A protein has these predicted regions:
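Aromatic- and charge-enriched surface segment that lines or borders ligand/interaction sites
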Residues: 106-154, 191
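Ligand/substrate-recognition segments at binding pockets and active sites
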Residues: 387-460, 530
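Detector for C-terminal structural segments
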Residues: 241, 340-367, 411-418, 443-558
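Ligand-site clamp/hinge motif
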Residues: 223-226, 253-298
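A bilobed periplasmic-binding-protein/Venus flytrap-type ligand-binding module shared by bacterial periplasmic
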Residues: 122-124, 249-253, 312-335, 339
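N-terminal lobe/hinge region of extracytoplasmic solute-binding protein
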Residues: 61-112, 150, 230
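Append "and occasionally in soluble cytosolic enzymes with long acidic Gly/Pro-rich linkers
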Residues: 327-421, 485, 511
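Gly/Pro-rich hinge or "lid" segments in bacterial periplasmic/extracellular proteins
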Residues: 177, 187-188, 194-260, 264, ...
Length: 558
């Protein structure tokens, strides 16, 4: 009964937001204008930033705002979606897969021992501020990520490049940090010398976290670079109205002739999925992410819309803070794992676009362990384990729920209510805690939670990005919000990271997954195939499995 009532309240809220969308307000901080009505999204973009020079203006609506526009300083997918348009990396991924292709480097060589990587850079490339892209710019960026004492690391201002530490074995001076030297051979040739092999070094070079920022912009903006991004990408930054919109304009001097095709891109925040769909159908926006799976069939049947499906490349999960009571108790974690009905969540909320998960790693990935036994939904076993944990009379806990829809969890509010209902059936009273997106990420990173909801989308096609990022002890307090620290797991992950034998790497990852499953620092819920939609005026749009696709080739039909 409680669940039905809560869903009714969510329904009322959705209706309110839909009405707000119909009046033209797509942001969280909407209010009436002096004339008593709101301008529509496109009019707001022009009013705030001036007219675009051409008529190719695309509005991309999403559920939440970006956290930072300094790519390496955040793991937030909504940030990477934007920085992908502004910046470029030495290498790029194929439009539809994680195949590594040339980027700012047109060619590269790898030594036989896997310890030297030489990149040959494109010539005649300029940053958006007019300065030259060269090998020294590459070196400056990698050094600032690796060295917290670097003048452009901005550590005193709270910058932490956790993803660099995860993907390159730590930071300057750390025992496992693999980048030993960076040698500028000439303006357009640079060599990376490694202390030991790294099985996914080239994939790292294509990730959205490690593109090249203008050194002149780092000097000019200092720690404000996260709000003043300057790269070499197809679009340049214009403005950012927090929790409302980010505006990018075509970079006229982009290195690839004929691109981009759009004159302007506006990334608009519309928190409610239903409101975004109303805006899409009305022509107010052109692309929406976070489509409710239940709405997919209706979109597919609509002649004015196009339905897209991303590859199954993510995990939606519930995580425990294992260093904090009461979830420092493994029996309690096992009890909760058995109490949550993953099948019901997958069937009720994903409309066939998800499969229940047993481990964090997606099934298509190398090293996926299909022999790990999932915690089956079993309330009786959950009650027994609850008693074993010392909570025969039940207990009260907090569940922190995500405030925005993400590709791995399009309706977090309802998921949290299902989990609340499941746990109360076995004697656990759940209080749902809600925060705005940026504070949510910060507070869970700081360990203020007991139990929380989040997810992870792959950005380089390698298992390490899931398992080490989420569960390696070195990442406690950053991407490891479970505060999970198991030396044996870390050793398997370290060995997998440093091997260039893919079969050996797969074995290490499989062994790590067995230990992780038994420790149960999280409840893997589902691997989803996120759906999104565009109007049929949008051409050449290809959604990437990473959720961060370039819009350089996209255009609007006349």
């Amino acid at each position: 009964m409680k669940l039905k009532f809560s869903i009714f309240i969510v329904w009322l809220l959705a209706i309110f937001l839909v009405l707000a969308a119909c009046s033209g307000d797509g942001g969280q901080n909407g209010g009436e204008s002096e004339e008593g009505s709101d301008p529509d999204v496109a009019e707001e973009a022009e009013a705030d930033t001036g007219d675009a020079e051409g008529d190719q203006v695309l509005i991309f609506a999403r559920g939440g705002d970006s956290e930072s526009l300094d790519p390496a300083s955040t793991t937030d997918g909504e940030s990477s979606r934007i920085t992908k348009q502004i910046y470029e990396s030495l290498l790029e991924f194929d439009k539809e897969s994680f195949e590594v292709l040339p980027g700012l480097a047109h060619d590269w060589e790898v030594s036989e021992d896997g310890l030297s990587y030489t990149f040959y850079l494109e010539e005649g490339v300029t940053f958006h501020d007019g300065t030259e892209f060269n090998a020294e710019a590459v070196k400056v960026n990698f050094e600032r990520w690796a060295d917290p004492d670097h003048e452009y690391a901005f550590a005193d201002d709270g910058y932490v490049y956790s993803m660099y530490g995860t993907m390159f074995g730590g930071f300057l001076g750390d025992e496992n940090h693999v980048v030993e030297e960076i040698n500028v051979v000439n303006d357009h040739e640079i060599e990376f010398v490694l202390s030991q092999p790294l099985g996914f070094f080239l994939q790292n070079m294509a990730m959205t976290y490690f593109p090249i920022t203008s050194p002149a912009a780092l000097e000019e903006y200092g720690p404000a670079i996260n709000e003043n991004p300057v790269g070499t990408g197809p679009f340049e930054f214009v403005s950012w109205a927090k929790d409302d919109s980010i505006v990018l304009d075509k970079f006229d001097d982009y290195r690839i002739e004929g691109l981009p095709k759009l004159d302007r891109v506006v990334f608009e925040v519309i928190p409610d999925n239903a409101a975004r769909l109303i805006a899409l159908r009305s022509g107010e926006i052109d692309i929406m992410d976070g489509l409710n799976p239940d709405d997919a069939a209706g979109v597919e049947a609509d002649e004015g819309l196009e339905l897209y499906e991303r590859a199954e490349n993510n995990i939606g999960y519930v995580g425990f803070n294992v260093q904090k009571e009461p979830f420092d108790n493994k029996d309690l974690r096992h009890a909760v794992s058995h109490a949550i009905d993953k099948e019901a969540i997958a069937e009720a909320l994903y409309a066939g676009y998800a499969t229940p998960a047993s481990v964090p790693l997606p099934p298509s990935y190398m090293g996926y362990n299909d022999e790990v036994e999932s915690f089956e939904y079993d309330p009786d076993t959950a009650r027994e384990l609850l008693e074993d944990a010392g909570y025969a009379d039940g207990l009260e806990i907090e569940l922190w729920t995500m405030p925005v829809a993400r590709p791995y969890m399009p309706d977090p509010e309802t998921v949290s209510e299902i989990i609340q209902n499941n746990l109360e059936e076995v004697g656990i009273t759940v209080t749902i805690v809600r925060e705005e997106w940026a504070p949510y990420l910060e507070k869970t990173m700081n360990g203020e939670h007991q139990m929380y909801m989040l997810g992870w989308s792959g950005t380089n096609g390698d298992p390490d990005y899931f398992l080490s990022s989420l569960l390696h002890g070195d990442n406690v307090g950053s991407s490891n919000r479970e505060f999970y620290d198991n030396d044996e797991v870390d050793e398997f992950l370290n060995q997998a990271k440093l091997s260039i034998d893919q079969d050996e790497r797969a074995s290490f990852y499989q062994q790590a997954q067995e230990l992780i499953a038994d420790d149960a620092p999280m409840v893997p819920l589902v691997h989803s195939r996120p759906v999104l939609a565009t109007t049929n005026a949008v051409e050449n749009y290809v959604p990437h499995p990473s959720t961060s696709e370039s819009l350089a080739e996209v255009e609007l039909a006349n």
